[in-house]
Swiss-Prot record:
This is DNA-binding protein HmvA. Keywords: Chromosome, Cytoplasm, DNA-binding. Binds and compact DNA (95 to 150 base pairs) to form nucleosome-like structures that contain positive DNA supercoils. Increases the resistance of DNA to thermal denaturation (in vitro). It comes from the Archaea. The gene is hmvA. It comes from Methanocaldococcus jannaschii (strain ATCC 43067 / DSM 2661 / JAL-1 / JCM 10045 / NBRC 100440) (Methanococcus jannaschii). One of its GO terms (cellular component) is cytoplasm. Homodimer. Dimers then assemble into higher oligomers, with the DNA wrapped around the protein core.
Amino acid sequence: MLPKATVKRIMKQHTDFNISAEAVDELCNMLEEIIKITTEVAEQNARKEGRKTIKARDIKQCDDERLKRKIMELSERTDKMPILIKEMLNVITSEL
């Protein structure tokens, strides 16, 4: 579980809008999914090199396109998602 207060603080650094508890919960869920996917890909990278330790380079080597597709799937999973979260996900994918 990601600390909701930290996620909300980060969100507030990027907007003057009010942020509902539901929006924070939804973004926390999405970020946890992104962490899960990234970890799985990093594990595969480490395994290919015969290691049992995930290193920073394994994270850096994660397939940007795979992550981008998953983030877009998450952002499209509901029409009820607050626009702010959709915009934040768009920013994340544009940085990949």
